[in-house]
Amino acid sequence: MGSGGESDAGGGASAAAGEGGSASSAVDARLARLIARARAADGHPPFSDGALAELATGAREVVWLDDVAAAVRTVSDASSASVTEAEFVVDPDARRHGHGRAMLHRLLVDAPGDLLLWSHGAHPGARRLAASHGLEPVRELLHLRGEVPSGAEFAWKTHAAGEPLATLANSVHGAVDALLAVNARAFAEHPEQGRLTRAEFDALAAEPWFDPEDVLLAWDGDRLAGFCWLKVEGGGSGEFYVVGVDPDYQGQGWGRRLVEAGMARLASRGICEADLYVEADNAPALRLYREFGFREDSIDIQYRWRSDPGH
């Protein structure tokens, strides 16, 4: 059970985000080995980039169980009734021996209030484990994949004011702060993405995959209207990591232009396939991405355990 990123045409596409599961500076060798083993066995990372970025800033901690299971959970005040967010993974060679059940039990016992957990891929075993402990599904996140049109079919787009899209690499001082401000406004009601901090952004920017040329910025004069943040790790595939449009500019085609520009950037890098994450109930975003040829690949489910079932 783990956490992932999401995607929204008006609000954004995200994995902080995210779903990358790359080993940040906060990941020690033991955890990095477990992440690699789980990813090889499952086809997807066990932890989201957002969780690992929070681990780097001290907002999350690692909990181990017998060296075969690890959880990355938020650090909370034991005296408060705050919601604990966690995701955990069991070593592929140690599964079906009760380690997942034991880890979930520990997380439930330790949680001062409610507990939120993600299940990647909606595995039947995770469904049964969640149901047996009284966890209920509260969110669904779709993982979409699509082909990147060839460079001949896409040109770099300009936004409504006629100015070309910039990148983080060639933008003015303060562009990161502007991006974070738009991100917070675009994802104001988003449980993870909207709270992205500068420290967490810096942790993600320190990852080997980060390229400031892959962060596309749409300016309206001196105001940032939206951005498209891409993630390319190699292998011929790229991710629409975050697509965010300021609420004042939503509904005006900015999201579409940013996705078009993202496709053009990926094509220029020789990328032939793209993926992203989107909330299952985000109808506008789903319509937009399906128009670009994206189709559902898998689904993640978030479960919630309520410390007070009556509320």
Tell me the role of every PLM-derived stretch.
Residues 1-53, 154-194:
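Short amphipathic alpha-helix that is part of the acyltransferase structural core
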Residues 192-200, 206-230:
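Phosphate-binding active sites in nucleotide-utilizing proteins
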Residues 1-17, 77-85, 91-164, 302-303:
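Acyl-donor-binding surface of acyltransferase catalytic domains
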